[in-house]
Amino acid sequence: MVVMPPQNSVNESEGRYLQDGFWQHGRFYGSWKPGKYLFPIDSEELNRLDIFHKVFLLARDNKPFLAPIRRPSPRIMDIGTGTGIWAINVAEECLSDAQIMAVDLNQIQPALIPPGFMPKQYDIEEPSWGPLLTDCDLIHMRMLLGSIQTDLWPQVYHNVFEHLTPGIGFFEHIEVDWIPRCDDDERPANSAFVKWAELFLDGMDRFNRSVRVTPQEHRQMLEAAGFTDIRQEVIKAYVCPWSADRNEREIARWFNIGLSHSLEAMSLKPLIEKLGFEAEEVRELCERAKRETCVLRYHTYCNIHVWTARKPGPQQ
């Protein structure tokens, strides 16, 4: 059943614009270009996206970006902005004079936005990014694996490169590798979380929207697009706060909350529509995985990958 909210209607409890959408598998999905974004856009999902903003801030010493900004009134794009929280954070706390275009397939940004914040509904799988901001000092992207057709990543990186300023334009890309890892074998032999991850990755592969993090391939695609000064950082995010390290515990607390909101939201469509699961089977697996990720004696973690790169100048 398609739900059509009134034009420019506002969800007062969340303070966000609603967009046309439909209910499926018990969740609300966006109806603009359906099938491209496989995850919900309901309140629970928007909260999940905001929680991961906190995770990434903690993982990066509370810095929303690390690229040097060398011009006054910089031009910035946030690709796949989601709720817009990163772009709003930058506009309000870091670069109040910046012009920031926040691009997403779905219109789920807040009703009240800071000066310089420009929400833009656009499909970044389009071959040309003609309507988007050019001459950018910084382009930021995170958690877009699964939202981009697997074979279109070289095209996306090329368009990022084309929209940066030569010499001083930087790109930052952050992804979570959802494959659970453990360095000391402290996790259950028949891990529900491992099973969930295997099925989720398989289902997304069958949609041709892979969520697999392949560091060497990403580096090669960035090099092929023309980037230089390519760096990659890998940060552990434990799924529960067992570590003696205070920072690791704090990242883990927030990652655990985000993960508990993520399991069902991310896996309903791939497991039901590509692997033949019933909705209740998916939810039962997710509940078992949630319980497992809250057991302190299990030392499972996921890796957060951060790529930074620069567009060289004409003489470089």
UniProtKB/Swiss-Prot annotation:
<comment type="subunit">
    <text>Component of the heterotrimeric velvet complex composed of laeA, veA and velB; VeA acting as a bridging protein between laeA and velB.</text>
</comment>
<keyword id="KW-0805">Transcription regulation</keyword>
<dbReference type="Pfam" id="PF13489">
    <property type="entry name" value="Methyltransf_23"/>
</dbReference>
<keyword id="KW-0749">Sporulation</keyword>
<dbReference type="GO" id="GO:0008168">
    <property type="term" value="F:methyltransferase activity"/>
</dbReference>
<dbReference type="GO" id="GO:0030435">
    <property type="term" value="P:sporulation resulting in formation of a cellular spore"/>
</dbReference>
<dbReference type="GO" id="GO:0005634">
    <property type="term" value="C:nucleus"/>
</dbReference>
<keyword id="KW-0539">Nucleus</keyword>
<keyword id="KW-0489">Methyltransferase</keyword>
<protein>
    <recommendedName>
        <fullName>Secondary metabolism regulator laeA</fullName>
        <ecNumber>2.1.1.-</ecNumber>
    </recommendedName>
</protein>
<keyword id="KW-0949">S-adenosyl-L-methionine</keyword>
<keyword id="KW-0808">Transferase</keyword>
<comment type="similarity">
    <text>Belongs to the methyltransferase superfamily. LaeA methyltransferase family.</text>
</comment>
<keyword id="KW-0804">Transcription</keyword>
<comment type="function">
    <text>Methyltransferase that performs automethylation. No other methyl-accepting substrate has been identified yet. Component of the velvet transcription factor complex that acts as a global regulator for secondary metabolite gene expression. Controls the biosynthetic gene cluster for beauvericin, a depsipeptide mycotoxin that functions as a virulence determinant. The velvet complex also regulates chromatin structure and transcription of siderophore biosynthetic genes and is required for infection of tomato plants. The velvet complex also governs expression of nitrate metabolism genes.</text>
</comment>
<keyword id="KW-0843">Virulence</keyword>
<dbReference type="GO" id="GO:0032259">
    <property type="term" value="P:methylation"/>
</dbReference>
<dbReference type="InterPro" id="IPR029063">
    <property type="entry name" value="SAM-dependent_MTases_sf"/>
</dbReference>
